[in-house]
Amino acid sequence: MDDRATTSRVSVLSYGLMVLGLAVLLVSTGPGADDRQGAVESSWIRAAAADDDPPPSGKDGQETDEPILGKDFPFEGPSERWPPRDRTPFPGRYADARHQAGNSRQADEAVGRALRWLAAHQSPDGRWEAGGFHHWCDGKPSRDEQPIDGQGKPLYDVGVTGLALAAYLGAGYTNRGDHDFAKTVGRGLKYLKDVQDPEGCFGPRSTQQYAYNHAAASLAMVEAYGMTGSPIFKGTAQRAVTFITQARNPYFAWRYGIKPGDNDTSITGWMGSVAMSARTINAAAIESGKPAPLVFEDTPIVDGIRNWLDKATDMETGRVGYLQRGTGPARPAGLVDRFPPERSESMTAVGVLLRIYGREHPAKSEIIQKGVKLCLDHLPVWNVIDGSIDMAYWHFATEALHQVGGEAWATWNDALQKALVDTQRRDTDACRFLGSWDPVGPWGPDGGRVYSTAMMALCLEAPYRYERVWAGD
């Protein structure tokens, strides 16, 4: 090739790159930069199709020298500035709707403190460490020589990362916008992308409990995709959903592993929750005149869940069993006496929630009404002595009773807020305890303080996190 032609092509390429750089700079910093973020993201994705990490703009959670914890901001998300143009799958998470959800000011402030505590203890690689969260403060190694109790087990890092992200998303915070949590959420989502295997499973499968890690991580990734519509997350979310559908037992539900043959209500509650979020995302797209973005067959999953619940439910009492009808909720070895299963209706709460998601009307279903009564007979009370604290139960029952609505929901939510608002840690600062909940309960030793804080934040977000299936009926 002629040297002059080569030089000319290099010059044209250099000029083109310079113009592109100036254009990106103007888009990133000029007037209306936030509104143009989606266009920048799309062009970046086309230019780097082989590497779908978040775009290097700083708006989607990239590392910067800025501290993670910023000003002591009010409990507000970016949603006033970026109202959804289409039907959003989770409309209650936008600030205007959130304020109308009826949550108390104290509950909203508690959520804000919890999210600040979680941000303080995120690891630089984006994860939350169930057992090592205390090593980090504001994105840097902690200099605090005093121990922080509440460590969990490292094998649950992927799961508690998913729960922490779900808490941010539930309050309306994604990796986009100029709020103080954008980088926190972006780093967490990138971590999950990095630990997903080719089959779609998040994290290692070194223990049978990996299904819980996958479910929690999937919930976060699927909802992040639903809230942003970003192609950065679409493939990861699709693979996560595909793994869940392929792991389900034919005609029934889930247990540990892929189509293991047996079922349990606990992991079915988590997997079913992801499936319902995926269904909600598809329904919102269809309502906006767009094709369903996730490849997902809803009917077989709903039918399989109902088949399992019918098999596991005592039709006389409404109580749902763990592995079979008549069995109580699971407890870790050595903690059965400390946390008696009969003081929790966690499996019943899962049953109520999933039946409503399966389009059973709470006012017309006798079995749902029986389950609701059992939950109301076991209201949340922060009693560290009697072994009744079960955060997994509180989480599922809160979601279930919110779906039921009416007096049942008012009774439950009143008890829940009394149990949680005053027991949130208010001492020290966010780099130690401020904003967290002590990991009391049967699963505290596994998930630790990150688990307890994320789960209790999710409970307090329930009034606006999901729409009611039977709203208006």
How would you label these PLM feature ranges?
Residues 29-473:
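Preference for long, amphipathic alpha-helical scaffolds in soluble/luminal domains
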Residues 5-31:
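Sec-dependent N-terminal signal peptides
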